[in-house]
């Protein structure tokens, strides 16, 4: 049930993910018209869910799919046949069921926070939405780490297509759903109907195509679906967690097709964009937080938008629960464990290893006294990344680089910032390395 999956994903940004995994993911959702039955294995879980989560579950299920009633029950979901696309008995797309293609209307271009790291991707998605099927951006491939806004832009483009032309048939699927639908069609001997469903839409949006790696039959079917849509000038928008040519297990001919249109990277947001995202998400929730709190979260959380949103949700939830004002002190206290975990994830040794591997060096090369250009530039870049991604002081960073003086670190940071304005290759290296830390 698609709306239940989206509900769980949203809840993981509002509550501790381990709590969602423990108490909510074991539930089995069964939709009956405008009602949903959530089956739990025992009374204890039902009582806990009812006390802690039921109100929010009702809100989200109503938002995602118009569900009016949510019921908790002990047992297991009955076996049912799930249709991914509304079809009639002839295999044509049903004209009696409003076609929304699993689009989440919450995501649009207005609530997407634009920054240097994503402005090209936003512009590309907007163009695809305005001129679907145009060969300059068909297919449109958005790639980058988790939680950087790829799916947001995909939904936003699909929603604009539907706004411009309400009869436009836009289908959004995660790659796992495409795979599951194909497996069901093989089992039911209904592959012809499966193919017609996808060939008769106006735009196809598929998330996380790296999931296709190693699945030969799935790639075969997607290859033919891609060709049919492309030849018919229907828009294709895809996302991937990395540049497709770097995905092992994707067939060369599929990689070639993906390169026909426009491929755009989304990088981790810089500090200013992170702060703007926190403030925008707070406004969406109707919460008011001081700028300095947004700056605190932006400075401490570097990896992706989901982490920023998770920190904000934790902060707002505790403020509402305790009735306390959101101050710097309150924020540091509330987010202490979360921020500590973030810092432990990205440490200077980790940065040194990733930079050394990226340039084909050894860590001892970065720490050596040699000043050849092939070593000096990666060393400076590693120092600048340590300044950007950790809370270590300049002297501490210098100590980690074989006892270098803090002025050396400061010079490296300034030099990298200056050179990135003119050297495209260095800027690309910086962006690629930042993406590695968001994975």
UniProtKB/Swiss-Prot annotation:
<keyword id="KW-0238">DNA-binding</keyword>
<dbReference type="InterPro" id="IPR001957">
    <property type="entry name" value="Chromosome_initiator_DnaA"/>
</dbReference>
<feature type="binding site">
    <location>
        <position position="150"/>
    </location>
    <ligand>
        <name>ATP</name>
    </ligand>
</feature>
<dbReference type="GO" id="GO:0016887">
    <property type="term" value="F:ATP hydrolysis activity"/>
</dbReference>
<keyword id="KW-0067">ATP-binding</keyword>
<dbReference type="InterPro" id="IPR013317">
    <property type="entry name" value="DnaA_dom"/>
</dbReference>
<dbReference type="Pfam" id="PF00308">
    <property type="entry name" value="Bac_DnaA"/>
</dbReference>
<feature type="binding site">
    <location>
        <position position="147"/>
    </location>
    <ligand>
        <name>ATP</name>
    </ligand>
</feature>
<comment type="function">
    <text>Plays an essential role in the initiation and regulation of chromosomal replication. ATP-DnaA binds to the origin of replication (oriC) to initiate formation of the DNA replication initiation complex once per cell cycle. Binds the DnaA box (a 9 base pair repeat at the origin) and separates the double-stranded (ds)DNA. Forms a right-handed helical filament on oriC DNA; dsDNA binds to the exterior of the filament while single-stranded (ss)DNA is stabiized in the filament's interior.</text>
</comment>
<dbReference type="InterPro" id="IPR013159">
    <property type="entry name" value="DnaA_C"/>
</dbReference>
<dbReference type="GO" id="GO:0006270">
    <property type="term" value="P:DNA replication initiation"/>
</dbReference>
<dbReference type="Pfam" id="PF11638">
    <property type="entry name" value="DnaA_N"/>
</dbReference>
<dbReference type="InterPro" id="IPR018312">
    <property type="entry name" value="Chromosome_initiator_DnaA_CS"/>
</dbReference>
<dbReference type="InterPro" id="IPR027417">
    <property type="entry name" value="P-loop_NTPase"/>
</dbReference>
<dbReference type="InterPro" id="IPR020591">
    <property type="entry name" value="Chromosome_initiator_DnaA-like"/>
</dbReference>
<keyword id="KW-0547">Nucleotide-binding</keyword>
<dbReference type="Pfam" id="PF08299">
    <property type="entry name" value="Bac_DnaA_C"/>
</dbReference>
<dbReference type="InterPro" id="IPR024633">
    <property type="entry name" value="DnaA_N_dom"/>
</dbReference>
<dbReference type="GO" id="GO:0003688">
    <property type="term" value="F:DNA replication origin binding"/>
</dbReference>
<keyword id="KW-0446">Lipid-binding</keyword>
<protein>
    <recommendedName>
        <fullName>Chromosomal replication initiator protein DnaA</fullName>
    </recommendedName>
</protein>
<feature type="binding site">
    <location>
        <position position="149"/>
    </location>
    <ligand>
        <name>ATP</name>
    </ligand>
</feature>
<dbReference type="GO" id="GO:0008289">
    <property type="term" value="F:lipid binding"/>
</dbReference>
<feature type="binding site">
    <location>
        <position position="151"/>
    </location>
    <ligand>
        <name>ATP</name>
    </ligand>
</feature>
<keyword id="KW-0963">Cytoplasm</keyword>
<feature type="region of interest" description="Domain IV, binds dsDNA">
    <location>
        <begin position="320"/>
        <end position="439"/>
    </location>
</feature>
<feature type="region of interest" description="Domain III, AAA+ region">
    <location>
        <begin position="102"/>
        <end position="319"/>
    </location>
</feature>
<dbReference type="InterPro" id="IPR038454">
    <property type="entry name" value="DnaA_N_sf"/>
</dbReference>
<dbReference type="GO" id="GO:0005737">
    <property type="term" value="C:cytoplasm"/>
</dbReference>
<feature type="region of interest" description="Domain II">
    <location>
        <begin position="75"/>
        <end position="101"/>
    </location>
</feature>
<dbReference type="GO" id="GO:0005886">
    <property type="term" value="C:plasma membrane"/>
</dbReference>
<dbReference type="InterPro" id="IPR003593">
    <property type="entry name" value="AAA+_ATPase"/>
</dbReference>
<dbReference type="GO" id="GO:0005524">
    <property type="term" value="F:ATP binding"/>
</dbReference>
<dbReference type="GO" id="GO:0006275">
    <property type="term" value="P:regulation of DNA replication"/>
</dbReference>
<comment type="similarity">
    <text>Belongs to the DnaA family.</text>
</comment>
<comment type="subunit">
    <text>Oligomerizes as a right-handed, spiral filament on DNA at oriC.</text>
</comment>
<dbReference type="InterPro" id="IPR010921">
    <property type="entry name" value="Trp_repressor/repl_initiator"/>
</dbReference>
<keyword id="KW-0235">DNA replication</keyword>
<feature type="region of interest" description="Domain I, interacts with DnaA modulators">
    <location>
        <begin position="1"/>
        <end position="75"/>
    </location>
</feature>
């Amino acid at each position: 049930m698609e709306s239940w999956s989206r509900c769980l994903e949203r809840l993981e940004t509002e509550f501790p993910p381990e709590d969602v995994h423990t108490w909510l993911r074991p539930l089995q959702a069964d939709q009956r018209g405008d009602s949903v039955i959530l089956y739990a294995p025992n009374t204890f879980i039902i009582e806990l869910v009812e006390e802690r989560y039921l109100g929010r579950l009702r809100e989200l299920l109503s938002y995602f799919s118009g569900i009016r009633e949510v019921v908790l029950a002990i047992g297991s979901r009955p076996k049912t046949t799930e249709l991914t696309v509304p079809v009639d008995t002839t295999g044509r797309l049903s004209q009696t069921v409003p076609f929304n293609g699993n689009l989440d209307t919450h995501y649009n271009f207005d609530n997407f926070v634009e920054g240097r790291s994503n402005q090209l991707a936003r512009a590309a998605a907007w163009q695809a939405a305005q001129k679907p099927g145009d060969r300059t951006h068909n297919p449109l491939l958005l790639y980058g780490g988790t939680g950087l806004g790829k799916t947001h832009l995909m939904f936003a483009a699909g929603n604009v297509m539907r706004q411009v032309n309400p009869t436009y048939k836009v289908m959004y699927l995660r790659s796992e759903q495409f795979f599951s639908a194909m497996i069901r069609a093989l089992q039911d001997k209904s592959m012809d109907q499966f193919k017609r469903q996808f060939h008769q839409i106006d735009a196809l949006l598929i998330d996380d195509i790296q999931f296709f790696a190693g699945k030969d039959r799935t790639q075969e079917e997607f290859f033919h679906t891609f060709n049919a849509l492309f030849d018919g000038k229907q828009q294709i928008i895809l996302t991937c967690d990395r540049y497709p040519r770097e995905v092992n297990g994707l067939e060369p001919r599929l990689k070639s097709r993906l390169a026909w249109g426009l491929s755009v990277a989304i990088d981790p947001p810089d500090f200013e964009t992170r702060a703007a995202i926190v403030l925008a998400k707070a406004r969406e929730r109707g919460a008011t937080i001081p700028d300095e709190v947004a700056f605190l979260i932006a400075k401490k959380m570097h990896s992706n938008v989901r982490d920023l949103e998770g920190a904000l949700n934790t902060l707002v939830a505790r403020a509402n629960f305790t009735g306390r004002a959101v101050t710097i002190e309150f924020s540091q206290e509330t987010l202490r464990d979360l921020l500590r975990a973030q810092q432990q994830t990205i440490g200077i040794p980790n940065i040194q290893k990733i930079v050394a591997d990226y340039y084909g060096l050894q860590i001892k090369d970065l720490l050596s006294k040699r000043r050849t250009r092939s070593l000096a530039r990666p060393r400076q870049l590693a120092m600048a990344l340590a300044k950007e991604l950790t809370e270590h002081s300049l002297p501490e960073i210098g100590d980690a680089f074989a006892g270098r003086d803090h002025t050396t670190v400061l010079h490296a940071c300034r030099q990298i910032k200056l050179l990135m304005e003119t050297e495209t290759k260095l800027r690309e290296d910086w962006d690629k390395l930042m993406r590695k830390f968001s994975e």
